[in-house]
Amino acid sequence: MTGRLQLHKLVVLGDGGVGKTALTIQLCLQHFVETYDPTIEDSYRKQVVIDNQACMLEVLDTAGQEEYTALRDQWIRDGEGFVLVYSISSRSSFSRIKRFHHQIQRVKESCASSPSYPGSPIATVTTQAPVPIMLVGNKSDRVTEREVSTQEGHALARELGCEFVEASAKNCINVEKAFYDVVRILRRQRQQASRPSLPGNSRTKTGGMGKSESFYQSDGKRGSRKDGEKHRSKPIKCVIL
């Protein structure tokens, strides 16, 4: 591949001890960390290929402890996509997910209302798009210690409007999916943001004599219309005084 790789900045958030570092190191270094060593801030980079397209992931592993709440705002400002982690064997970590999600929304809304700084992800992803978030129920290997059901995880993800997966950093189950699906959302948002748009429904013509015309509807779906077919739109009037 020639040229510079697309960089995606992902931030891993969640309570202390839920396996944020274990997931990150399993993704980037392909091994499982057995011991728990509280993290303040660690950054990892890895070149990956997602859907036959190479890119660079920058993954920020963050502290889950309450005393680092002030630092978390800056981590969120710098992030493009987020991996929200709880442990299926910890009801309290699951209960705190909404607090992390609220903080993400608050910080991103604040960023959207202020000028973006150089290099800010705000400049590359439309601020009107939802923040890409993956909810991860980690430690799915701890079957006998489960305190949070899979159904509860799905229900919370629907409530928060984000994706959901259960994973095991120890057994390397759904680790790549947890991160790669966030990248896929970011790519879709960038593609949609780069499409030329007009007031109302966005349309791109491929027509000409004897050809069809394609367009994008307001819900993002692609449609088509053959020559001679009418569409409901008001004629454009130009008055020269």
Swiss-Prot record:
Q: Name one GO cellular component term.
A: plasma membrane
Q: What happens when the gene is disrupted?
A: Displays slight reduction in conidiation, but normal growth, appressorium formation, and plant infection.
Where is the sequence biased in composition, kind Basic and acidic residues? 219-230
Mind listing the GO molecular function terms for this protein?
A: GTP binding; GTPase activity
KW Phosphoprotein (keyword) present: no
Give the highest taxon in the source lineage.
Eukaryota
How is the activity of this protein regulated? Alternates between an inactive form bound to GDP and an active form bound to GTP. Activated by a guanine nucleotide-exchange factor (GEF) and inactivated by a GTPase-activating protein (GAP).
Q: Where is the composition biased (Polar residues)?
A: 191-205
Identify residues that carry Cysteine methyl ester: C238
Q: Where in the cell is it found?
A: Cell membrane
Question: Which positions are lipidated as S-farnesyl cysteine?
Answer: C238
> What membrane topology was assigned to this protein in its record?
Lipid-anchor
Q: Which Gene Ontology BP annotations are present?
A: signal transduction
Prodomain residues: 239-241
Enumerate the UniProt keywords alphabetically.
Cell membrane, GTP-binding, Lipoprotein, Membrane, Methylation, Nucleotide-binding, Prenylation
Annotated motif Effector region, positions:
36-44
| Classification via Pfam families | Ras
List of residues binding GTP: 17-22, 33-39, 63-64, 138-141, 168-170
**PANTHER family, A to Z:** RAS, DI-RAS, AND RHEB FAMILY MEMBERS OF SMALL GTPASE SUPERFAMILY (PTHR24070)
The Swiss-Prot or TrEMBL record describes its family as follows: Belongs to the small GTPase superfamily. Ras family.
Q: How does it assemble?
A: Interacts with farnesyltransferase beta subunit RAM1.
User: What functional role does this protein have?
Assistant: Modulates the activity of the adenylate cyclase catalytic subunit and therefore affects the biosynthesis of cyclic-AMP. Plays a role in both surface attachment and surface recognition of appressoria, a highly specialized infection structure for plant penetration. Regulates appressorium formation by coordinated regulation of cAMP signaling and Pmk1 MAPK pathways.
This one is known as Ras-like protein 1
**Taxonomy-wise, where does this protein's organism fall, top ranks first?**
Eukaryota, Fungi, Dikarya, Ascomycota, Pezizomycotina
Q: List the gene name.
A: RAS1
